[in-house]
C-alpha cells in the first residue's frame, strides 16, 4: 500500500489524522536513509573485493608469465613450442581482462557511491533538518497558546489585544514552517524514485560492459585454444607411446647398473668429506670431488643432498701427493691426506667406505703412511710470527689502506676460498716474501686480501692473544667499570710475548684507521669486534661456554681498537700497594669455598720495567674476599706481633719463580699473608710446606708423579677438578696452561692449580 498524500490545507488544522500521515512519511524516509547507508557500505565492500580479486588475478597472471617451460632435449617440437608459450598467452588474456575490470572499478565509485552519498546527505538530510525545525515550532506554538488561554479576563483590554497579536504571529510562523516541511517531505519522496535508482543502473551498465569485453576476448582466444588443445593431445599420445620403453630401460638399470654407467671424463669422482678448520675446532663438510689423472687436478664442490644445494664456492687444486691416514692418528675411518701444489697445508678427506678409499688412492697413486712420530708436529704451524709472518700482515694492511679502506663491508665480506689460498701460498713462499707490497697485492681483490689476513691469523699455532690469557681477557671485559676494563686489558697486553704484542699493535693501528672511515666502509668498531673477536681470541675447545663468551671477545677487541694508542704506547700503571689493598677490604665473617678459576696461581714481581708482571689488581680482587675470613683472621692474629712494626716496603709480594709454582714461605712471616698461596688455606691448621724439602722439586723433572692437595678447591670449568684438602692425585704432570698441572682423580683427568698441591 502506498503512502497517503499530504494536503497543504491540513497544515493549518494540524489534525491527528494529518500528524499520523506525516509520521508515516517520516518513517519511510528513515527507512530509506538506513537502506542507502547499508547499500553504500556494501558497495564499498564490493569495490574493495573487486580490487582484491583484480590484484589476485594479476598476480596469478604474473606467475604464469614468469614461468618458462624447459623441455627435455636440445630442440623442441611444434607442439612443445605451442605448449611452452601457452602460459604467456593465458597471462596476456587475464591482464587484458583485468585492465577492463580496473576501469569499471575506478568508475564505480563515481557512478554509484558518490551519487548515493549526495542524495542521502543533501535530500534526506535536509528533510531531517526541516523536521527538527517543525518540531521546535510546534512546541513553541503550543506553549504560547496554552499561556495565552490562561490569561485572566480581568486584565486590561490593551494587554489582551497585545497577547492576541502575539499568538497570531506565532500561529502564522508555525503554519509557514508546516507548509515548508510538508513540501520537503513530498519532494524527497518523489526524488528518490530517480536519484536513488539511476546510480544503480549506471553501475550495472559498467558491469555489463566488462562482461562483454570478456566475451570479445574469449572469441579472439578461441583459435589459440583450439591449437593448444590439439598440441596437448598430441603430447599425451607421445607420452603414452614412450612410457613403456622408459620403464623397460629402468628395469635394466636396476638389474645391472654397472653395465649402463655413463662414460666419464674423470678418472675418479664421487662424494668425500673434507676436514675444514673453523674458529672452534674442525668440521667435516661433504664435497662432490672429481679427479683427472692427466692434469692431476682435483675439483671439490661443497654439496649436501639433505640441504639441497651448494654450501660454498668450488675449489680446484693440483695434486702433489696422496697418503693414507694412519688409523690411530684420527678418530674418523676411511681417511687419507692430500697435499696440493698450489695450496699450503694438508687436506684431510674421508671416503664413504674402505673400498671407496682404495679406489681414490689408486686413482691418485696414493701411498701408505710413513710411521714417523715427528711427522705430525712438522706439518703443523706453517704460519708463524716470524719475519715472513710480519711481512704478510704488513703487505695485506698496506694494500687495504692504500686502495680499499673505503670499501663497504671491509673484512666482513669474505673472498673466494681458492683465491685466498692461492694468495697465501704466494705470500708464504720465501722466494716472494721479500717483494714489495704492490708487486704482491695489486692484482688481488680487497676481499681476497682481507680474507688472507684473517686466515693467516687463524693458521697460527695458537691465537694471537694466547690461550693462557683468554680467561683473563674475558674477565676483564666482564668488569662493570669501563676504566677498569681498559686498565686490566692494558696490563694483560703487556704480558703477551713481544712478537704477539707487536703483531697485535700493528693490527689494532690498522683497524683503528678502518673504523675512522666507517661512514664509507660501514665497519664500525663494534662490527670489527664481531669479525676479529673469534680470530684473535679463539678458544682451545669448542664448548657452549666458549660460544657464550664470544660477545665478550668482541668487547675486548673494541677496547683494543678504541684505546690502541694508550694500550700499546704506554706502560701499564703500577697497581696499588698491598697494604692499601688490605686496608680497603671489608672484613667478612662468611667464608665460601675458594674457586680454582678465581684464585691466583702464580705471581711475578720485579723491579725491571722490561719484564712481564702479573696483573695483581684482578688477582687480589678475586681472592681477598676469601682471605679475610674467620680462618684467615686466626692466622693473622697469631702473627700480630711482627705485623705491628711493618712499613709499606715490608708488605712487598714475595717472588714466586715459574719453575717452583708450589713454593711457600718456610715459616709464617709478615709477607706470607700476601703470598700467592696464603689465600688458599682451608683451615688455620693447614700445614705449610717448606721450600727446602724434596716436595719442592720441579714437577717438570718427574713427569708422572703423585701429589697431595694442600687446600680445597671448587672447579668452575669442565676441564678442572674439584677436591678437598688432603686429596691424592695420580699421574700428575705439567699441562699446556701456565700455572696448572694435569692429574687424575677417581678416574677423571683434569687441571689442578700448581700451588695447591705438593708432590709425594
Curated annotation (Swiss-Prot):
Give the start-end ranges of region Disordered.
571-617, 658-701
UniProt site positions, description: Arginine finger: 412
Gene Ontology molecular function, alphabetical: GTPase activator activity; phospholipid binding; protein-macromolecule adaptor activity
**One protein family per Pfam:** BAR_3
Checking CDD domains in the record gives: BAR-PH_GRAF_family, BAR_GRAF, RhoGAP_Graf, SH3_GRAF
Record's keyword annotation contains Ribosomal protein: no
Q: Ranges for the PH domain?
A: 265-369
Tissue spec. comment: Detected in embryonic brain and liver, and at low levels in embryonic eye, heart, lung, intestine and skeletal muscle.
Compositional bias (Low complexity): 674-701
* Keyword presence, Cytoplasm: yes
Query: Keywords in UniProt for this one?
Result: Cell junction, Cytoplasm, Cytoskeleton, Endosome, GTPase activation, Membrane, SH3 domain
Please provide, in alphabetical order, the Gene Ontology terms of the cellular component aspect for this entry. Answer: cytoskeleton; cytosol; endosome membrane; focal adhesion; mitochondrion
Domain BAR: where?
7-262
For this entry, list what GO says about its biological process. mitophagy; signal transduction
Task: List the subcellular locations.
Answer: Cell junction, Focal adhesion; Cytoplasm, Cytoskeleton; Endosome membrane
SH3 domain spans which residues? 702-760
> In this protein, which residues make up the domain named Rho-GAP?
383-568
Locations of Polar residues compositional bias? 605-617
Assembly information from the UniProt record: Binds to the C-terminus of PTK2/FAK1.
As for what it does, the entry says: GTPase-activating protein for RHOA and CDC42. May be involved in the regulation of neosynthesized protein export through a Rab-endososomal dependent export route.
The protein's name is Rho GTPase-activating protein 26
Task: Name its species.
Answer: Gallus gallus
Gene of this entry: ARHGAP26
